[in-house]
Amino acid sequence: MNMSLPADRDTAKKPSAQKPSAHAQNATAAVDVTALGLTESEYTQICSLLKRSPTKSELAIYSVLWSEHCSYKSSRRHLRQLADLTEVTKKHLLVGIGQNAGVVDIGGGWAAAFKIESHNHPSFIEPFQGAATGIGGIVRDIIAMGAKPVALMDSLRFGAASDPDTQRVADGVVSGISFYGNCLGVPNIGGETAFDPVYQGNPLVNVLCVGVMRRENIRLANASGPGNLVVLFGAPTGRDGIGGASVLASDSFTSDAKANRPAVQIGDPFVEKLLTECCLELYAADLVVAIQDLGAAGISCAASELAHNGRVGIRLDLSAVPLRDTTLAPDEILVSESQERMMAIVHPDNLEAFFEITNRWGISGAVIGEVDNSQYLTVVHEGKTLVRLNPKTLTGPSYNRPVKKPAYLIRRSAANRLPVTNDPHLLREDILQVISCPNLSDKSVITNQYDRYVQGNTALCHPDDAGVIRMYKNTGVALSCDGNSRYSYLDPHAGAQLAVAEAYRNVSVVGATPLAVTNCLNFGNPENPEVMWQFRETCRGLSDACKRLEIPITGGNVSFYNQTDGKDIFPTPVVGILGIVDNLTQTLTSGWNAPDLFIYLLGVTRPEFGGSVWADTMYGHIGGVPPKLDLARESRLSNLLVAGAKKRVFESAHDLSEGGLIQAIVESCLRHGFGADIALDTIRATSLTEALFSESASRVLVSCRSQEDLRDLCRRNSYEYTLIGTTRHTGELTISEIGKFTLNELSDARQKVTRVLFRG
């Protein structure tokens, strides 16, 4: 479902010109609407809109399209601020919020479509299929924009690494992502994986996809042309996924939720691969007037969105729908979420050519309706009219839910009161313990399951800070997705801004100019005023950060009801940023690539441990406030990094975020196997603990050959720099105040947890 933001509508509607049959009308007499996910108040509102009782099929449609997942009824009023654009942020934006994905101009007549979405609840119940179909769904969103999918990323959150069920969920999710993505032939170039007890029983599976196309080939989900035909093509419709949007994605559930397995969709990546190539050929032949993928709510959602966006009517005949299960009732056909299906609007003169292409690719299809001037969605089955309603009524209500600042924020204790030390023996133990914690551990056992180089255009991928895909000539598209739920738990407004800043920085450190943002907002129960306060503050933080950085939000996804057994997850905004690389020969990797390089820390280190990995790992402490962020400095840092890459001032660049300086140093050593000699006394810090583990924002670790060039670049951008060491040939990291670590020792420490968890 698109993150469209329709206006809060007047619920007074004219009665339909043609009512459904009496038989169909009476079908809702004994229906328990609450079992369908509707409230009694919402059912009354539906009756008021229709001026009558809904039919069984109409009620099935409303129950899904008025779900939280589809309607954004709790989030819509807060999301409006994300759509605010200035003349500067409009510069590269071609398609914004409201379509299947955002589209930005990347130069040379090319455009990139990108979006991130969630598949959280299904991935707990059936981890493999839940995650796999999450990949399939986001890929079809990109295809529906007219683009060829060229890269994937994922942001994953699992429960405690020590919990027995985490291995089942994590292993299944990663296997599902790798299976579907690898079979589809789309490279997975990066992302993030985190573990925390707050996600026990409610993992987060957020998937980002980017596709490319010529600017003139952008497709929209706007039906037009009365008399044009509605064609359903792809896999036949089955029973899987019925009620997925309302049963799984729009309600809380208990940790024992196996009964919901039928609501999890089943995917076939080989059909999706054929469907992808088929669509691209249909676009090249200009045979599609409009197109919509089938995801949440299936046929009912796709048809209503096409009609609503195009301000036309659509008449469907369910008798013409190709079925995998012939026992499906009409209302089940309407809301089935069977995968690998698309709905296209086709001119009658082009129908023969359309089916010639689908048949060549082995894709089945059928004409199931046509566009008309009625402004209504009409559905018939075996001659009986089952549905007659205005698609505008399907956008759902807009709630102004109460908000309340959480009580835990009043009781939080400051992290800067935790014990710090300058003792070298204690610090050595701290370093090994922190870098081996689940959230900082080596994730290559995950990413090695993904085909990162299929299609042959991957220039950078994990473990670098951003992935880069080769584009026209020698340019590239850079992608990063980031989030820190501990920061958002402590301060949702600041946490959202820090997520934007980190993704922005990660794109910049590879030498790319950030262009646009997509986001996935994962929250608990919206009926909880404290959760709604978190959500409101997060939206405000996203809006403020993007305006300050002059970068547009192109769309995204909201996932509420991430709550199991009454316990809400931490607020978890995940931000994806797309950037453009002017020259791929100037991209930067995250690790030292030679000995005898000078190592510099850019930025200022402060005693900032609120929400840090160090505080959580060493003391089980999550309190205080997140690191302070100055977005003007973040913008200057980005300009400095991009300029330094173009002028070849840097040999490498690595963002500092979770784990602070020591994590960046260790990863930079292990990236290409070069050690380093580090001295911490040049860093202005109150303790060695602060120098090593502080998570102060807007900092980057760089290496260079010419110190004068680096210092001159920093001075011209008014940015702080500190020489902290040099790289070395031997496989050792020496910190003068602490001692030596072998790279094997560091590598083993970082692999302990994930090797066990993912059967590595």
UniProtKB/Swiss-Prot annotation:
Catalytic residue positions: H69, H119
Record flagged with keyword ATP-binding: yes
Predominant subcellular localization, coarse grouping: cytoplasm
Highest taxon in the source lineage: Bacteria
Residues binding substrate: S118, H119, N120, H121, R140, Q265, E337, S338, Q339, S559
Organism: Tropheryma whipplei (strain Twist)
Positions bound to Mg(2+) 1: E117, N557
Protein name per UniProt: Phosphoribosylformylglycinamidine synthase subunit PurL
An annotated Gene Ontology molecular function: ATP binding
Pathway given in the UniProt record: Purine metabolism; IMP biosynthesis via de novo pathway; 5-amino-1-(5-phospho-D-ribosyl)imidazole from N(2)-formyl-N(1)-(5-phospho-D-ribosyl)glycinamide: step 1/2
Annotated spans, Disordered: 1-25
Annotated catalysed reactions: N(2)-formyl-N(1)-(5-phospho-beta-D-ribosyl)glycinamide + L-glutamine + ATP + H2O = 2-formamido-N(1)-(5-O-phospho-beta-D-ribosyl)acetamidine + L-glutamate + ADP + phosphate + H(+)
Keyword annotations of the record: ATP-binding, Cytoplasm, Ligase, Magnesium, Metal-binding, Nucleotide-binding, Purine biosynthesis
Assembly notes: Monomer. Part of the FGAM synthase complex composed of 1 PurL, 1 PurQ and 2 PurS subunits.
